[in-house]
Amino acid sequence: MDHPSTSSLPRKKVKAGVKKAGKKTGKKTTGKKKTTPSAIGNRKGKGAACLLVLLAVLSYLAALSLGLYIMTGCISTTAQSNNIYLAELSTNTTYDMSLRVGYFGGCVSVTELTEAPYTGRNSSTQTSTHCVSNLRRKNLDDLSEDLWEPLKLNSSTIQSSLQTFFNTTLPQAKHLQENVFFCEPPLVHLLLFFVTGIMLFVAMTGTSRKRSYRAMLVTAIALSAFSLALALVTVLGSLQSMNALLNTSASGAQRALGDSLYISRGKAMLGVQGALVAIVAVFYLTMGVVFVRRTPEGGAGYIIQAFQNVRGPLKRMGRR
């Protein structure tokens, strides 16, 4: 009777030993460290975030440079600034003369024919250009002297023709600056873009748990929208104003005003303004993607939560 019970005991011990051995081997195999898909995803995410920040910084600097370039058009001849103008008043009579108008400054160019000695033939042309930083001065006589005196013209005949040209074009140039091409929209856009860019870069280093942080972010978003709208208004305003002056569509380039006087649009200025709008849009879009990637809720949840935190203080201020 006792024989079957004694024979079953070793079998149970063997099975238990097999189970223990299996557990030990399992521990050894799982002890090795392997690269998980989540770690690879984190590396890719950090690389994408760095690229986005780099794109934001580059677009921010490029937009600021273009904005300053637009505002300083026709202020001086350095960096080809005299080629960035809104409109040009020109004549092609005995001497080719032109007056280019920017938001603040203006440039005059005079082309003379130089004769080769002992031949009497026209050998070449010489163009003299000078710019003034402020074309909005009230005294036209002083303004005309500041424009033509540094040119160092060769004959008194050219000076007389240039003075007649200024008597006709300077009042029109001042009218264009004061009543057609307003300097306020591009100037306010540049200031708002500079301020909102700094606010957004500072917000990247903060935390979304503080209400002051979210209030600053909402303010930056509102000012950013206004800045982008001003950039768009500037380029469309320049295009529509010149279309009205030329009495043509965007493809028209020049119109005769009478007495061999012409007005033409500044195509380079229009191109730079369009590029500025595109770069500003890229900057704000990139910054939006950067902030959306920081929150698991996504962009809509992030903005809604920020507005909810600001809505309470605004209601209290309205009640007061």
From Swiss-Prot:
Positions of region (Disordered):
1-40
Q: How does it sit in the membrane?
A: Multi-pass membrane protein
Protein species of origin: Aspergillus terreus
State the name under which the record lists this protein: Uncharacterized ophiobolin family sesterterpenoid biosynthesis cluster protein
Gene Ontology biological-process annotations:
terpenoid biosynthetic process
GO CC terms in record: membrane
Q: Which residues are glycosylated?
A: 92, 122, 154, 167, 247
Compositionally biased intervals (Basic residues): 10-35
Record-annotated membrane-spanning stretches: 51-71, 186-206, 216-236, 272-292
Keywords from the named record? Glycoprotein, Membrane, Transmembrane, Transmembrane helix
Q: What does this protein do?
A: Part of the gene cluster that mediates the biosynthesis of an ophiobolin family sesterterpenoid.
Q: In which pathway does it act?
A: Secondary metabolite biosynthesis; terpenoid biosynthesis
Cell compartment(s), UniProt: Membrane
